[in-house]
Each structure stands twice: as C-alpha cells, then as structure tokens.
UniProtKB/Swiss-Prot annotation:
Reaction it catalyzes: Hydrolysis of proteins to small peptides in the presence of ATP and magnesium. alpha-casein is the usual test substrate. In the absence of ATP, only oligopeptides shorter than five residues are hydrolyzed (such as succinyl-Leu-Tyr-|-NHMec, and Leu-Tyr-Leu-|-Tyr-Trp, in which cleavage of the -Tyr-|-Leu- and -Tyr-|-Trp bonds also occurs)
Official protein name in the record: ATP-dependent Clp protease proteolytic subunit
Lineage: Eukaryota, Viridiplantae, Streptophyta, Embryophyta, Tracheophyta
SUPFAM superfamilies attached to this UniProt entry: ClpP/crotonase
Role summary: Cleaves peptides in various proteins in a process that requires ATP hydrolysis. Has a chymotrypsin-like activity. Plays a major role in the degradation of misfolded proteins.
Length: 202
C-alpha cells in the first residue's frame, strides 16, 4: 500500500510554529537536490528553478546534487549543465547507483574537486542517440547535422572537465563505456570516491 511522500517537521528561522512539509521540500531547503529518474524537460526545469531561486536567497551556500539516473534528453541536460555553471554557489555532484548518458554529463558538470561517486556507483558515457528510424530523408539529414553539433558540444565539455585528450574522449563516446567509481575517478569524471567519512562533506 503506497504511503506517499514522507512528511517531516520544519520551522524556518524566526517562526514560532513548525509545519509538516514533504521530505524533499525540507531537503531542498538544505540545498540537497536529487536527479533520481530519466532526465526530461520537467525534471530539468524543476532543478533549474530550484537552483536559481535558492541562489537568489543565498549566494554563498553550496548545492549538493545526488544523481541516480539512466540518462535522458540531451537539450534539457545541457540546460541543467549550463545553469550549474551559471549559479554563484558551487554545485557538488554525487553519483549513487548509476549516472549514465546525460546523467554522467551532469555528474562531470559539478564543481571541479567537488564531484564524488559512492564506492559501488557506476558511470556510463556514450554519444547522443537519435530517432533516425522515424525520420523522412530530409529530416534525417537535418537531424544528423544537429546530432553532430551536439556530439561536438558534449565532447568539448568532457575534454574540458576531465582533462583527457580529445582523442580519448572521442574514442570512449563511440560506444557505451561503463566505469566503476575508481575508473570514473581515473577518467576525471569524478574527483573523489566516497568512503565512510564522506558524510562530513554534506
């Protein structure tokens, strides 16, 4: 039997009475954000809105973005990535479970030195996919050109943020490359592999 989203007591500073709020609302107020599903326009817009609003509220407190995502749409992912670079607070990215495809792109977009993977997390990178089989000939050519531009954009970001040569990143993106947490660290996608002391970071 579903129980819905758990609620917790929360009182803002200066308020006498605490109120029951859903747990995600409470966590968001502590700058703890979650990408726990396929990335689409809706979840991207929610995370962008939270980052912008909370940045206006306080420009000094870092964000912690927990990622467990199979990937998703490229354009909403790029929008979220750009927002992470735009907002004044640093964005810590934390991979738990799986960060695949656009999930790994968001993971690598965290503040350099503040990207972390849990010990048993998995990371997967590959080139952007398309629905060519649904397109007419003219649409196919236009979509292929756009896809090539998107691939170049993603590749440049991975090169810039991992410190790996262009040829290494390009080769990795030719196919699905699955990495353990330590392999992701060696690839420069994350900076740290979490241990029992990582709770001190949040």
């Amino acid at each position: 039997m579903p129980i819905g989203v758990p609620k917790v007591l929360f009182g803002s500073p200066g308020e006498e009475d605490a109120a029951w709020v859903d747990i995600y609302n409470r966590l968001h107020r502590e700058r703890l954000l979650f990408l726990g599903q396929e990335l689409d326009s809706e979840i991207s817009n929610q995370l962008v809105g939270l980052m912008v609003y909370l940045s206006i509220e306080d420009k000094t407190r870092d964000f912690f973005l927990f990622i467990n995502s199979p990937g998703g749409w490229v354009i909403p992912g790029i929008g979220l990535y750009d927002t992470m670079q735009f907002v004044p607070p640093d964005v810590h990215t934390i991979c738990m479970g799986l960060a695949a495809s656009m999930g790994s792109f968001i993971l690598v977009g965290g503040e350099i030195t503040k990207r972390l993977a849990f010990p048993h997390a998995r990371v997967m990178i590959h080139q952007p996919a398309s629905s060519f089989y649904e397109a007419q000939a003219g649409e196919f050519v236009l979509e292929a050109e756009e896809l090539l531009k998107l691939r170049e954009t993603l590749t440049r970001v991975y090169v810039q943020r991992t410190g790996k040569p262009l040829w290494v990143v390009s080769e990795d993106m030719e196919r699905d490359v699955f990495l353990s947490a330590t392999e992701a660290q060696a690839h420069g996608i994350v900076d740290l592999v979490g241990d029992e002391n990582m709770g001190d970071l949040v």
